């Protein structure tokens, strides 16, 4: 495959083939962006009829943590690029695939290995790169966990080293929280082993996601780093419920945020978009986490930027030029399922879209849970405050209902 020079025709011998590992709502938007560039897309997930399955050329259901199943599928499909969109993947198999020259892993196999759990990326950021982070400790057993909490002190945060969307994450404020927090962390991890990170609580003014793009500069042919405007977000129990762009911040804090983002993404390497999560207080900035893929808080870019984070990712991985500029202030607000049922319906869509500047993305997930993210409302405005009010009003208008 000639990166940045040639794209083929889907379903033909000339096709440029991309396999996405993970076909949720973020993967779905990446697939749509790739489809618009004439790319043949293979979507893979652990359950049938995932959102990305519905828009891909081909769909597969496998256990992506099974290295043999993953390698067999890659050998059968022969993609030019493999693009992980979730963390729960057999990353050692990806490393072997990359080393054998079977295909390119985005951004790199090493990056997927380091970011698949919080331990790898925290040690890279704090111990190798010397980036400012919260105090932290890792624990493998309940006794180690209790000792780590005693060492870090209250309040503190516990997270499974392998989890996403706030699963298994809680804040400990006293000794009475220790045992329940351990049980919750064990239930929320993606794999069956009890390793957690305990983090000291940082008293921050706000959190941001600094979307960072590593793409080929057409003038030099070299990889260049560029940045989207900072995204502010509100999280509840570790899960994003609202985001907006741009987040107002001081020039010094923005400079420090981008320096941290540049350093950590350069260490990970490769091409694509990275979601770098940071805590900010005044001019001070602390590194939190990084995802080597589009970020859920970045759904706001579907309204705020001419090229969304998904289009930026698609272009960057294909070696094409990117333009991450902000077009307008915008916001997003999550629409939850509200009930536990397969094949739900949505009422109030007309009212939601009647809100000035509003738009919707209903993800098409086949099964709803009360707190499962089933869609998102987007809105533009003259400023962030107006956009946030509109997005929340549009989201509140949508009513998930039983289809029975």
UniProtKB/Swiss-Prot annotation:
<feature type="binding site">
    <location>
        <begin position="25"/>
        <end position="26"/>
    </location>
    <ligand>
        <name>N(1)-(5-phospho-beta-D-ribosyl)glycinamide</name>
    </ligand>
</feature>
<keyword id="KW-0460">Magnesium</keyword>
<feature type="binding site">
    <location>
        <position position="207"/>
    </location>
    <ligand>
        <name>ATP</name>
    </ligand>
</feature>
<dbReference type="InterPro" id="IPR016185">
    <property type="entry name" value="PreATP-grasp_dom_sf"/>
</dbReference>
<dbReference type="GO" id="GO:0006189">
    <property type="term" value="P:'de novo' IMP biosynthetic process"/>
</dbReference>
<dbReference type="GO" id="GO:0005524">
    <property type="term" value="F:ATP binding"/>
</dbReference>
<dbReference type="InterPro" id="IPR011054">
    <property type="entry name" value="Rudment_hybrid_motif"/>
</dbReference>
<feature type="binding site">
    <location>
        <position position="118"/>
    </location>
    <ligand>
        <name>ATP</name>
    </ligand>
</feature>
<feature type="binding site">
    <location>
        <begin position="164"/>
        <end position="169"/>
    </location>
    <ligand>
        <name>ATP</name>
    </ligand>
</feature>
<dbReference type="GO" id="GO:0043815">
    <property type="term" value="F:phosphoribosylglycinamide formyltransferase 2 activity"/>
</dbReference>
<dbReference type="GO" id="GO:0005829">
    <property type="term" value="C:cytosol"/>
</dbReference>
<feature type="binding site">
    <location>
        <position position="296"/>
    </location>
    <ligand>
        <name>N(1)-(5-phospho-beta-D-ribosyl)glycinamide</name>
    </ligand>
</feature>
<dbReference type="InterPro" id="IPR005862">
    <property type="entry name" value="PurT"/>
</dbReference>
<comment type="similarity">
    <text>Belongs to the PurK/PurT family.</text>
</comment>
<dbReference type="InterPro" id="IPR054350">
    <property type="entry name" value="PurT/PurK_preATP-grasp"/>
</dbReference>
<feature type="binding site">
    <location>
        <position position="277"/>
    </location>
    <ligand>
        <name>Mg(2+)</name>
    </ligand>
</feature>
<dbReference type="InterPro" id="IPR048740">
    <property type="entry name" value="PurT_C"/>
</dbReference>
<dbReference type="Pfam" id="PF21244">
    <property type="entry name" value="PurT_C"/>
</dbReference>
<comment type="subunit">
    <text>Homodimer.</text>
</comment>
<dbReference type="Pfam" id="PF02222">
    <property type="entry name" value="ATP-grasp"/>
</dbReference>
<keyword id="KW-0479">Metal-binding</keyword>
<keyword id="KW-0658">Purine biosynthesis</keyword>
<comment type="pathway">
    <text>Purine metabolism; IMP biosynthesis via de novo pathway; N(2)-formyl-N(1)-(5-phospho-D-ribosyl)glycinamide from N(1)-(5-phospho-D-ribosyl)glycinamide (formate route): step 1/1.</text>
</comment>
<feature type="binding site">
    <location>
        <position position="289"/>
    </location>
    <ligand>
        <name>Mg(2+)</name>
    </ligand>
</feature>
<keyword id="KW-0436">Ligase</keyword>
<feature type="binding site">
    <location>
        <position position="85"/>
    </location>
    <ligand>
        <name>N(1)-(5-phospho-beta-D-ribosyl)glycinamide</name>
    </ligand>
</feature>
<keyword id="KW-0547">Nucleotide-binding</keyword>
<feature type="binding site">
    <location>
        <begin position="199"/>
        <end position="202"/>
    </location>
    <ligand>
        <name>ATP</name>
    </ligand>
</feature>
<keyword id="KW-0067">ATP-binding</keyword>
<protein>
    <recommendedName>
        <fullName>Formate-dependent phosphoribosylglycinamide formyltransferase</fullName>
        <ecNumber>6.3.1.21</ecNumber>
    </recommendedName>
</protein>
<dbReference type="GO" id="GO:0000287">
    <property type="term" value="F:magnesium ion binding"/>
</dbReference>
<feature type="binding site">
    <location>
        <position position="365"/>
    </location>
    <ligand>
        <name>N(1)-(5-phospho-beta-D-ribosyl)glycinamide</name>
    </ligand>
</feature>
<dbReference type="GO" id="GO:0004644">
    <property type="term" value="F:phosphoribosylglycinamide formyltransferase activity"/>
</dbReference>
<feature type="binding site">
    <location>
        <begin position="372"/>
        <end position="373"/>
    </location>
    <ligand>
        <name>N(1)-(5-phospho-beta-D-ribosyl)glycinamide</name>
    </ligand>
</feature>
<dbReference type="InterPro" id="IPR011761">
    <property type="entry name" value="ATP-grasp"/>
</dbReference>
<feature type="binding site">
    <location>
        <position position="159"/>
    </location>
    <ligand>
        <name>ATP</name>
    </ligand>
</feature>
<dbReference type="InterPro" id="IPR003135">
    <property type="entry name" value="ATP-grasp_carboxylate-amine"/>
</dbReference>
<feature type="domain" description="ATP-grasp">
    <location>
        <begin position="123"/>
        <end position="318"/>
    </location>
</feature>
<comment type="function">
    <text>Involved in the de novo purine biosynthesis. Catalyzes the transfer of formate to 5-phospho-ribosyl-glycinamide (GAR), producing 5-phospho-ribosyl-N-formylglycinamide (FGAR). Formate is provided by PurU via hydrolysis of 10-formyl-tetrahydrofolate.</text>
</comment>
<dbReference type="InterPro" id="IPR013815">
    <property type="entry name" value="ATP_grasp_subdomain_1"/>
</dbReference>
<dbReference type="Pfam" id="PF22660">
    <property type="entry name" value="RS_preATP-grasp-like"/>
</dbReference>
